Amino acid sequence: MKIGILSQFPQLYSTQRLVAACESRGHEAVVINTLNCYMNINSIKPSIHYEGQELVGFDAIIPRIHASVTFYGCAVVRQFEMMGVFVANDSISIARSRDKLRALQLLSRKGIGMPITGFANKPNDIPDLINMVGGAPLVIKLLEGTQGIGVVLAETKTAAESVIEAFLGLKANILVQEYIKESNGSDIRCFVVGDKVVASMKRQGPEGDFRSNLHLGGCGETVKITSVERKMAIAAVKAMGLVVAGVDILRSNRGPLILEVNSAPGIEGIEQTTGISVTEPIVEYIEKMVAARKTNRPIIA
């Protein structure tokens, strides 16, 4: 097969590992810079062009769309869909997961556990908003933030009011979320492919920081997840409509809670922590799905 990897960063560990996984299974892997694609949108033969050439002959696409280019990246993925190319994560699902508010509403609709979350537009709603999530301490998140950036822990009600007022004054969209103290600055990252959790790790934030993101200096360690956590991770991915995703879970006194579903999860951290390849299952899944499409067999994830 000819498999395209949509990524702005060809030298990134994640990109190189996907290339290696494709090639090790006898496929041709082509890294395509998402932002260098341009599209011919018509009703006869929609196409994508790249560096002066039309992109043709692709059997599948693995989207690795960076959060900063979600709008354009989803347009490119959507164009491949219109061309009949199989995509590991479709454009609608990527867009769903990138909109934190919409993602939480989808999880809520499916009855999947998550931290209590508030969303408001007017400064005069702040006191009730704070009470809604259980009071301080609480977490305030920018909707556009990624990798722990734009996430603030407000220790007191006064601090929470000040931070929320400041963000709303800047016309920023924010979520106000209950703080799960018992998680102690850690979470569980589950890497899901299809209907399977192929790897999982515990991430612990640096001392004094409640954020567990590895990009912010957190560390990872192997962990055995429970059957409930496994089922919840898979259910969260299905709620988004994704196939390949990273699911962040907090362990709380009332059971596991979904923090986030990431459509382009980091690969380096979880592979180096667990020693498990997460890229090979991605390629294996693509092989099965493309073969099923070609033979018109029922597709079983």
From Swiss-Prot:
GO CC annotation, single: cytoplasm
GO molecular function: ATP binding; metal ion binding; ribosomal S6-glutamic acid ligase activity
Record's keyword annotation contains Magnesium: yes
Lineage: Bacteria, Pseudomonadati, Pseudomonadota, Gammaproteobacteria, Alteromonadales
InterPro entries: ATP-grasp (IPR011761), ATP-grasp_RimK-type (IPR013651), ATP_grasp_subdomain_1 (IPR013815), RimK (IPR023533), Rimk_N (IPR041107), Rp_bS6_RimK/Lys_biosynth_LsyX (IPR004666)
Required co-factors: Mg(2+); Mn(2+)
Binding site for Mn(2+) 1: D248, E260
ATP-grasp domain sequence ranges: 104-287
Binding site for Mg(2+) 1: D248, E260
Annotated Mn(2+) 2 binding sites: E260, N262
PROSITE patterns reported for this sequence: ATP_GRASP
Organism: Shewanella sp. (strain W3-18-1)
Cofactor binding: number and manner: Binds 2 magnesium or manganese ions per subunit.
HAMAP family: RimK
EC number: 6.3.2.-
Residues that, per the record, bind ATP: K141, E178, Y179, D187, R211, S212, N213
Binding residue positions for Mg(2+) 2: E260, N262
Any single GO BP term: SOS response
Family: Belongs to the RimK family.
The protein, known as: Probable alpha-L-glutamate ligase 1
Annotated keywords: ATP-binding, Ligase, Magnesium, Manganese, Metal-binding, Nucleotide-binding, Protein biosynthesis
Keyword Manganese belongs to the record: yes
